Amino acid sequence: FGISLGFGEKSVKEVCEAENVDCDTFLAVANFISSEQTSFSVEELPKLSIPSLMDYLKNAHTYFLDFVLPMLRRKLIEAIGCSREDNVAFLILKFFDVFVNEVREHMQYENEQVFSYVKALLGGKLNRKFNITMFASHHSKIDERLKELKGIITKYYTESSDNLLLSATL
């Protein structure tokens, strides 16, 4: 949501108001993430601000692409090394890089296509060439690739000098 740290003794509502963030949406997302839910409750849905939710998702994409994935790559290299002499480690890193590219394309697709579609819907315009099920098919492919990467590492990479770091990276 772009809320800065160091908000002191302010309540959630006060912080959200100061940061111009919809409080109900913030709380719904925070509860969603902290309880590992797979969907919002029926009671939460009418309270959600779709524009605030889209802003959150755009910020999450930026955080993931610019911070999380590069950090994971560094940790992966640190855990498995990455010399061309170690073919398995080199292939794992190449697979990771392909995965990152797919994630980047997926998030760009969401930012450009899905969010534009939702924004148009909010404005009362329906694009009959696009529907949300098209978007859903993109998500399952990314999840499958991540599981595949984890499977490859746990099944084929046996030479880790730092198993704790590799486990933490996974």
How should these model regions be labeled?
Residues 1-170:
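Small-residue-biased structural context
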